[in-house]
């Protein structure tokens, strides 16, 4: 049984979150949680929270055994970018893009 959890509009770029997602794809959830706990990146904390949510969803909604679960799929899509302005010299301004991403984790007992 596949169970999904999503974090939409996560305040990290998709490029940075994908580096973390690649670390846990296909692993058992217990191993994935350990990896994320000791990964020193901001995106690791965000991905860990989504993974914990997926595990809780599987246990509560589908009655799955946590020991059998593995990360079947994990992907990170780009969300909308927030446009901001940074003042520069001589009255100019630069545009800053604050990027967001959508993190999706699918856990399965198969």
From Swiss-Prot:
Is RNA-binding tagged as a keyword? Answer: yes
GO biological process: one example: translation
**GO molecular function terms listed in the Swiss-Prot or TrEMBL record:** rRNA binding; structural constituent of ribosome
Q: Which domain of life is it from?
A: Bacteria
The record, for CDD domains, names: Ribosomal_L22
The GO cellular component terms are:
cytosolic large ribosomal subunit
- The answer on whether this UniProt entry bears the keyword RNA-binding reads yes
Give coiled-coil spans as residue ranges.
none
Q: Which UniProt keywords apply?
A: Ribonucleoprotein, Ribosomal protein, RNA-binding, rRNA-binding
Q: Name one Pfam family in it.
A: Ribosomal_L22
Stored PANTHER family:
CHLOROPLAST 50S RIBOSOMAL PROTEIN L22-RELATED, LARGE RIBOSOMAL SUBUNIT PROTEIN UL22M
Q: What is the annotated role of this protein in its UniProt record? A: This protein binds specifically to 23S rRNA; its binding is stimulated by other ribosomal proteins, e.g. L4, L17, and L20. It is important during the early stages of 50S assembly. It makes multiple contacts with different domains of the 23S rRNA in the assembled 50S subunit and ribosome. The globular domain of the protein is located near the polypeptide exit tunnel on the outside of the subunit, while an extended beta-hairpin is found that lines the wall of the exit tunnel in the center of the 70S ribosome.
Q: Would you identify the family this protein belongs to, as annotated?
A: Belongs to the universal ribosomal protein uL22 family.
Subunit description = Part of the 50S ribosomal subunit.
Protein name as catalogued:
Large ribosomal subunit protein uL22
Q: Which organism is it from?
A: Glaesserella parasuis serovar 5 (strain SH0165)
């Amino acid at each position: 049984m596949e169970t999904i959890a999503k974090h939409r509009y996560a305040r990290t770029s998709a490029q940075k979150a994908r580096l973390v997602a690649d670390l846990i794809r296909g692993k058992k959830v217990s191993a994935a949680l350990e990896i994320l706990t000791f990964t020193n990146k901001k995106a690791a904390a965000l991905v860990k929270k989504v993974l914990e949510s997926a595990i809780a969803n599987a246990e509560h909604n589908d009655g799955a055994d946590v020991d059998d679960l593995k990360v079947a799929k994990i992907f990170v899509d780009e969300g909308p970018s927030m446009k901001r302005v940074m003042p520069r010299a001589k009255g100019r301004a630069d545009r800053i893009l604050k990027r967001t991403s959508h993190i999706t984790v699918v856990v399965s007992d198969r």
